[in-house]
Amino acid sequence: MTTATDRQAFHARLLEIGKERYHDKHPFHAMLHGGGCTTTQVRAWVINRYYYQSRIPMKDAAFLSRCDDPDMRRAWRSRIEDHDGGVEEGGGIRRWLRLAEAVGLDPAYVGSARGVLPSTRFAVDAYVSFVREKPLLEAVASSLTELFAPKIHSERIAGLLEHYAFADDAALAYFRQRLAEVPRDVEFGLAYVLDHADTREKQDAAAQALTFKTDVLWAQLDALYSAYVTPGRIPPGAWDGREGVIREPRAREAAE
């Protein structure tokens, strides 16, 4: 085992991964936040991102099933509640389906995940498997993309409000709520990683786990861009731009 670099330097290393690799720099997000997406492209993003959102509590449940420490389970289980909500209301998944309805999609269709791109499904399922199978330190480290999430949520709220008529408080409730939830989650996760990555090998593994997670996020956007922007090659079985649409866009929404 090699002596770990100091805590501050390791923290800086993790932040640098986000600076270089986080998906806020993907061209699809520039289009989305700048009002450059068509209605079809926005809907495709909502459909595919739903699959990621829906698997987050499954990922966290897999993590908890491996965790022997009750204090850690108590701290982590709120992540499942944040996404699944209560029996009748609340939760990020329900908020995301409100966004789906706001952009003219049938929430039941989106929730079925029938139109999800194969690459999206593959990337997200790989993330769930990673958390289920890797050491706890690496599983926690893979969640640290949350360090960089508040910036993109803020940019998304501002951009959608400026450019798309569907954007109102109800439609954007998911992002506003995440701005409140993420700081708590990332404080715990970051402290755990900094405390437990006590050798250089563990630090390297944690950094690689965070890099893997940025790849998962980037791969989803690459698939979306390829299918619905350019070259516009939609894989068999993926959303065709028509299924699940329940209304046409209003005047200020992105036009075909």
UniProtKB/Swiss-Prot annotation:
Pathway(s) it belongs to: Cofactor biosynthesis; pyrroloquinoline quinone biosynthesis
GO BP, sorted A to Z: pyrroloquinoline quinone biosynthetic process; sulfur compound metabolic process
EC top class named in words: oxidoreductase
Origin: domain of life: Bacteria
S-S bonds: none
EC code(s) of this entry: 1.3.3.11
SUPFAM superfamilies, per the entry: Heme oxygenase-like (SSF48613)
Catalytic activity from the UniProt record: 6-(2-amino-2-carboxyethyl)-7,8-dioxo-1,2,3,4,7,8-hexahydroquinoline-2,4-dicarboxylate + 3 O2 = pyrroloquinoline quinone + 2 H2O2 + 2 H2O + H(+)
Keywords assigned: Oxidoreductase, Plasmid, PQQ biosynthesis
MF-aspect GO terms: pyrroloquinoline-quinone synthase activity
Its biological purpose: Ring cyclization and eight-electron oxidation of 3a-(2-amino-2-carboxyethyl)-4,5-dioxo-4,5,6,7,8,9-hexahydroquinoline-7,9-dicarboxylic-acid to PQQ.
UniProt record similarity statement: Belongs to the PqqC family.
Protein name: Pyrroloquinoline-quinone synthase
